[in-house]
Amino acid sequence: MPYQQITVNVNDAVAERLADALMEHGALSAAIEDAYAGTQNEQAIFGEPGMPAEQIWQQSKVIALFGEHDEAAAIIQTATQECGLKDLAYTGETIEDQDWVRLTQSQFDPIRISDRLWITPSWHEVPEGSAVNLRLDPGLAFGTGSHPTTRLCLKWLDTQLKNGESVLDYGCGSGILTIAALKLGAGFAVGVDIDEQAVRAGKDNAAQNNVDAQFFLPDGLPQGQFDVVVANILANPLRMLGEMLAARTKQGGRIVLSGLLDEQAEELGGIYSQWFDLDPAETEEGWARLSGVKR
């Protein structure tokens, strides 16, 4: 059975009200996204450090899903009128029903990070039995190895991590970097995320990979410093978290930062150079990674 997907661009004053109204009048689902997602103007909002707790993007997309025979246009008209909106433009497309599990699995093949490091979904055979294989399935938390920022951090761990070092993965998402660190020789690794779902996903993924990783919400992170601190998040929280991440890094320890665009590397480098001697930025597909040693 096909579905109707409707996308409406609105401002921050009405996005949540419109999503609620669409659900009340029959939408199967309604989601709110940054209208500028994937561009330089993308904003880190929900739950990001340094951002107000109650805030939404100034320009948002409300994406609603309807059944094949639902009167989507009428529902949108009713919902927009309730929200005080008139003649609101929207776009629509048909989404074909599929075997979503099989489709999802077909889109995720093993990913080769380096000669010795692979990421392999659980439904695939391990491509290189002698390699370090991370068993990781796509889920609700960010980090499957397909994004350039994740790959940049994995490549650093693969080539620079020393046996027995302690690692803090701040903004751990799926826990991929925490797990990789342990499989690559770290003596101790901790993942931290503001999202409870990510913390649960990290624990599940660590169990699947037979590694003893610990995962916490920020308030639960024990005191202490680490040999290596990795933060693969967005530029705005990286700006806000510099002093804290530096404090968590041992003197002579190293930091690895990603989640920033190419053009943001110079600015972030200026901030973190207060505490670290930084190497030149490494880039991949428009994204950057900074790394350096704490003075």
Swiss-Prot record:
Its main location: cytoplasm. It is found in: Cytoplasm. One of its GO terms (biological process) is methylation. It catalyses: L-lysyl-[protein] + 3 S-adenosyl-L-methionine = N(6),N(6),N(6)-trimethyl-L-lysyl-[protein] + 3 S-adenosyl-L-homocysteine + 3 H(+). S-adenosyl-L-methionine binds at T150, G171, D193, N232. Its EC number is 2.1.1.-. Coiled coil: none annotated. Keywords: Cytoplasm, Methyltransferase, S-adenosyl-L-methionine, Transferase. Pfam families: PrmA (PF06325). The keyword Methyltransferase applies. The keyword NADP does not apply. It is an enzyme of class 2 (transferase). GO terms for molecular function: protein-lysine N-methyltransferase activity. GO terms for cellular component: cytosol. Gene3D superfamilies: Vaccinia Virus protein VP39. Belongs to the methyltransferase superfamily. PrmA family. Methylates ribosomal protein L11. PANTHER family: ELECTRON TRANSFER FLAVOPROTEIN BETA SUBUNIT LYSINE METHYLTRANSFERASE (PTHR43648:SF1). This is Ribosomal protein L11 methyltransferase. It comes from Neisseria meningitidis serogroup B (strain ATCC BAA-335 / MC58). The gene is prmA.
